[in-house]
Curated annotation (Swiss-Prot):
Function: Catalyzes the aldol cleavage of 4-hydroxy-4-methyl-2-oxoglutarate (HMG) into 2 molecules of pyruvate. Also contains a secondary oxaloacetate (OAA) decarboxylase activity due to the common pyruvate enolate transition state formed following C-C bond cleavage in the retro-aldol and decarboxylation reactions.
Subunit structure: Homotrimer.
Entry cofactors: a divalent metal cation
Protein keywords: Lyase, Metal-binding
Domain of life: Bacteria
Annotated a divalent metal cation binding sites: D101
Binding site for substrate: G78, D79, V80, I81, R100
Keyword Metal-binding: yes
EC number: 4.1.3.17, 4.1.1.112
Coiled-coil boundaries: none
Protein name (Swiss-Prot/TrEMBL): Putative 4-hydroxy-4-methyl-2-oxoglutarate aldolase
Stored InterPro entries: RraA, RraA/RraA-like, RraA/RraA-like_sf
Amino acid sequence: MAISFRPTADLVDDIGPDVRSCDLQFRQFGGRSQFAGPISTVRCFQDNALLKSVLSQPSAGGVLVIDGAGSLHTALVGDVIAELARSTGWTGLIVHGAVRDAAALRGIDIGIKALGTNPRKSTKTGAGERDVEITLGGVTFVPGDIAYSDDDGIIVV
């Protein structure tokens, strides 16, 4: 389900003080600086096999929220996984952890927000959980809710 993008500041003005605005300060990495879509989630720690499996499945404009426990020790997403996500219809990735291939990510037509970078690869054992509620920056990301992301931040409705 493709969602029309709305600026996060406009959503805050419309929703008011009860808005679900993520307090974490993510950096932009992908070729799109704004994106919106229904949320899917993966929780994994320094292992990206499960998220690669999820991103291999077609999406109609979804946003994958990846809880990597904030680890900057290894990258969960690089250019290969980002291109896979773009090719299967995902519109955005929110990574509570690190990415790599930062220069290449800027050229891929997908939104990517992450805490930072590390060139080190993650493991690939498949450990983790999917479609679970994830709380980041005071906001709970619930599968099926809608995430809006731009240069001002991330809103969940």
